[in-house]
């Protein structure tokens, strides 16, 4: 018979277990403190290495950006120098061609359009002279274009010596980069401002019919009934704003945190009615002001026409005065021609063909000017005579239709004198 094996039971006391756990915790704490100190040293070294690498990368990036700026400016200067040389050669050829064409036309003018002798006088300007004036204008325009092409280089400023410093001057390089970034931002802001101006112009073109009508009719308004766009906008805002104590048909979320008013869908018909009423009021006031202005203008025109008729009755002796002025003008011209002859005789001495040609040019110019003055005087005198012949009354004319002198002494002794600014002849 097999005897049963006995198993020994392991009896563990709680005190022994507590001691074992304490010893294990002590070993763990010592190990953790040692591992934490070594890990902290490693992290500090990694942080310093990483910071050095970042500083080095930033320094390299700044140097690279400076090199790119220098290369960009060098390329721009080279391109502008090429454009300048090309424009210079092109404009020189254009100037040479204009000089050649001008000389050819001037040669044809001097050969074909010789001035006529002193009698008869020609007041019209030769064709070649007009061509010369047009060529002169074209040549001046090309010269201005050519001179403006040299001003392109002034826009680009090359890098100064202070901007190409060694790598150690990090603060100075940072200032340079900030300046360049600020300049680029200013250029972008300028472009945005240009876009805003274009958008504002488009918005002005898309104005409503009411604003357009008011803008067209404010010129005819009386100063007491003057209306401008700001007044209309203020009136619209005042009428659209609800009363604080009254019940409103608007939603709860009409006013947001910034107290900005947003009308709901229920309020749109009311707003439309108020705007239409305001439009009608404004248009009625405009029409009333225009009617008053028309009445005033009619009265002024009536008064002016009455004074005009009174003044025209005074001007019966005007043709004789014009004839006297015409004769005195002819005498002055003859005297001037005589003085020219005398001066030329004293200065030039004996006449030759060249001197006669110079005289011919000078007398052509003098005759052209004098004939134009005489022609203008004759036209004004004829116009006055025609108006007087129309407006003169029948009892003050002869059987042949010639005007008689009108007794106008009683008009000159009136108490109410006539304003000279209202004379319309």
UniProtKB/Swiss-Prot annotation:
Membrane topology: Single-pass membrane protein
Region (Disordered): 393-413
Keywords: Coiled coil, Glycoprotein, Membrane, Transmembrane, Transmembrane helix
Induction line: Induced by srfA, during development. Down-regulated in grlA null-cells at 16 hours of starvation. Rapidly up-regulated by hyperosmotic stress, which is dependent on dstC. Shows early transcriptional response to sorbitol exposure.
Main location: membrane
Coiled coil: 41-91, 172-208, 292-340
UniProt-annotated glycosylation sites, renumbered to this chain: 25, 28, 36
Compartment(s) where it occurs, according to its Swiss-Prot or TrEMBL record: Membrane
Protein name, UniProt field: SrfA-induced gene G protein
Taxon lineage: Eukaryota, Amoebozoa, Evosea, Eumycetozoa, Dictyostelia
